[in-house]
């Protein structure tokens, strides 16, 4: 894609973040700064694609944008998993999930965001009070008879996260 077309595409998505009541003021301010910056590198990297699940899960640098880890991308992924669980386990009396996290920046916030979205979708949530290692989370899913679980872990190569 030509650079100007890519910039225009990214600016269009960024504008939707700036103009929607769905996003908090701090996020909107950061996005506005990217749009107004003559150097479009950060804007492009933040909005040129949507984070996708890979072998390591949902991975990315923290910050505003569709290609970043933030409460909005975590929320969208959680809503997708909620939809899947409600569709595929609709005959169960109660669908349940385990939500865990580690000590990285915003990990607890992301875990609470996910827990709230699961709950809003009628899914019972077992949210660990504190950080836990992945094997403990895996054990909890089986021990509690949950249909799924998510663990918000540090996986970004960025030292700023």
Go through each PLM region and give its residues.
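An N-terminal, well-structured beta->alpha segment
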Residues: 15-114
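Short hydrophobic/aromatic residue motifs in ordered secondary structure
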Residues: 57-59, 127, 161
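N-terminal small/polar loop signature for handling phosphorylated ligands or for N-terminal nucleophile
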Residues: 98-152
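Short, well-ordered strand-loop elements centered on a beta-strand within folded domains, enriched
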Residues: 10-13, 17, 156
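Secondary-structure boundary motif
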Residues: 87-91, 143, 161
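Conserved small/polar residues in nucleotide/adenosyl-binding loops
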Residues: 154-161
């Amino acid at each position: 894609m030509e650079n100007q077309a890519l910039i225009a595409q990214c600016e269009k998505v960024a504008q939707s973040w700036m103009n929607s009541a769905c996003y908090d003021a701090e996020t909107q301010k950061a996005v506005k700064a990217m749009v107004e910056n003559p150097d479009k590198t950060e804007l492009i990297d933040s909005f040129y694609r949507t984070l996708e699940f890979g072998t390591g899960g949902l991975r990315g640098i923290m910050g505003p944008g569709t290609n970043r880890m933030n409460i909005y991308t975590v929320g969208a992924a959680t809503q997708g998993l909620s939809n899947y669980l409600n569709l595929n386990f609709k005959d169960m009396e109660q669908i349940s999930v385990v939500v865990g996290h580690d000590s990285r920046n915003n990990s607890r916030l992301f875990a609470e965001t996910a827990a709230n979205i699961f709950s809003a979708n009628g899914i019972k949530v077992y949210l660990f009070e504190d950080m836990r290692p992945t094997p403990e989370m895996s054990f909890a899913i089986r021990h509690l008879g949950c249909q799924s679980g998510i663990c918000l872990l540090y996986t970004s190569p960025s030292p700023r996260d």
